[in-house]
Amino acid sequence: MTTHVKIHGYHIDVFQHVNNARYLEFYEADRWEWMNKRNFINWAIKNNLTMAAVNINVNYIQGVLLGDELTVVTRMDKIGSKSAVCYQQIIRNNAGGSEVVSDAYVTFVFIDNITNKAIVIDDELREKLALFKSGTDDFIQN
């Protein structure tokens, strides 16, 4: 999935750059687009499941400034028995080319909304998650 963000004044903090907390918003926005594009949210609701982030590991590589144009990309990295991990990048696009300004690994589980407990990732859910492994052409190799 790909989300485009142009940095405006409301993204900037008192130090004239994008605060680290904003990166999390950009990452989450792309994950929502990622799930919406594949109708995953409706499927999860129908199956009484909630996707919950349990760990986010973010690397801040370069600062982001007013006027920067960013692309956020997401792909599934690993599917385990009870959790899965997606990999994300924020890429700055400028006249000189593109560069990664941040990357992140997000680990998440699925909660059964009836029992309020994490579930084992069964074959059906694994198939749905495997669809998110495609579309990695926009990534920049680190």
Regions of interest found by a model, annotated:
Residues 1-3, 60, 64-66, 77-142:
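HotDog/MaoC-like acyl-thioester-processing domains
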Residues 34-84, 99-102:
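Hydrophobic beta-strand-centered segment that forms part of the acyl-chain substrate-binding groove
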